[in-house]
Amino acid sequence: RDLVRSRGLGDVYKRQKKYTRLADAFTPLAKGINSEYANQTAYDSISIHGGSGFIMEYKCQRLYRDARIFSIYEGTTQLQVVAAVRYITNGTYLSIMKEMLEGELSCDCMKGLRERVAKLVQLYEEAVEKVNASENQDIHDFLARRLYNMTADIIGSLLLIEDASKAPELFKKSAHVFVRMAEEEVIGHTAYIKAFNPEDLEQFKAVEEETEEA
């Protein structure tokens, strides 16, 4: 650090530290969600051929296998959730969202859509606070995937809105469709998390613990 200061590289060091932190936070988020989207898209492409016979005739069956291998090669989604959850609970993603909401848009046509996403950020913050308030690690683990999906939905929406403000002819429709999907998922997950209590975990256990006979 002394060498950095002596050469006047303080700003470079700060930027490097910032982007290293962002890369650490976004890598598990991007890997997990992209593999899930790839799987869903490939699965949907197979579904449209339903009833036509031998699926091996279509390239989509190969793409579906590739998508499955991709998700395993990059680490299963659950492993990516484990890697990302600390950035959820410590507020890293929330800070990024709020910073993105304050950024300038190239086109006013996206302001209304961003206001809708701002409401989702509020719900997300409430959901994170609810989970953080619990000292039960099982609850943290159980609800982590929903928080992970909410994180990806909101950040994906904000990135798409930013692109749409620069090139509305290319991304405006996609932004509206994606935000609508994000609203459905974030609102639903928030309701689920807020209503969840520690005793609810018992309902999800496959095998009940054997009670000792008196």
Residue map of PLM features:
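Short glycine/serine- and small hydrophobic-enriched flexible loop segments
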Residues: 4, 43, 83-87, 158-163
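Generic anion/oxyanion-binding catalytic loop in active/binding sites
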Residues: 2, 23, 146
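Single conserved hydrophobic/aromatic residue that forms the stacking wall/gate
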Residues: 2-13
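C-terminal amphipathic alpha-helical interaction region
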Residues: 91, 103-214
